[in-house]
Curated annotation (Swiss-Prot):
ATP binds at residues 6-14, 24, 131-136, 155. This is Corrinoid adenosyltransferase. Belongs to the Cob(I)alamin adenosyltransferase family. Pathway: Cofactor biosynthesis; adenosylcobalamin biosynthesis; adenosylcobalamin from cob(II)yrinate a,c-diamide: step 2/7. GO terms for cellular component: cytoplasm.
Length: 176
């Protein structure tokens, strides 16, 4: 039988990828825990939209967040074993998505109040979770090394989610 519990965290510590242990209230755990929360919220967004292109983008974002989560959950030894990290090309892909979506949805004429439909509201929840993650990463970067690409990706991700919510709000007959 495969068990998902190890009992090693019962004392309030957790293992990083690489083997070292840290307290469960360490800012790194807060960061990768928020990444996990965001991945789950993007799954809710995926289930809420009927637009195939948005689903494809959301799934790609989830995969990149797993990459980020692995980096945040790694110690120095673990970092050397990672096969992938967020790079400049990932940031550029988000910028292209934002530009396409904003061109399609048109200029903003007023502040956006979330809730026009379920899918857009869920995307706005994901956007605010992303902003929280960004604040955590900024705080984390004050005491620990954090690659600039990771922080920049999260900054763009919140804008990408906003642009996707705008698509949901401005596309007729897509209310989920």
């Amino acid at each position: 039988m495969y068990r998902i519990y190890t009992r090693t965290g019962d004392n309030g510590t957790t293992a990083l990828f690489g083997g070292s242990r840290i307290d469960k209230d360490d800012i790194r755990v807060e960061a990768y825990g928020t990444v996990d929360e965001l991945i789950s919220q993007l799954g809710v967004c995926y289930a809420s939209t009927r637009q195939a292109e948005l689903r494809q983008e959301l799934h790609a974002m989830q995969k990149m967040l797993f990459v980020l989560g692995a980096e945040l959950a790694s110690d120095q030894k673990g970092l050397t074993r990672l096969k992938q990290r967020i790079g400049e090309e990932d940031i550029q892909a988000l910028e292209q998505l934002i530009d396409r979506n904003m061109a399609q949805s048109g200029p903003l004429k007023e502040f956006v109040i979330p809730g026009k439909n379920l899918a857009s509201a869920q995307l706005h929840v994901a956007r605010t979770l992303t902003r929280r993650l960004e604040r955590i990463l900024i705080a984390m970067g004050r005491t620990l090394t954090l690659r600039d690409e990771a922080r920049r990706y999260i900054n763009r991700l919140s804008d990408a989610l906003f642009s996707m919510a705008r698509i949901e709000e401005t596309t007729p007959d897509v209310c989920a």
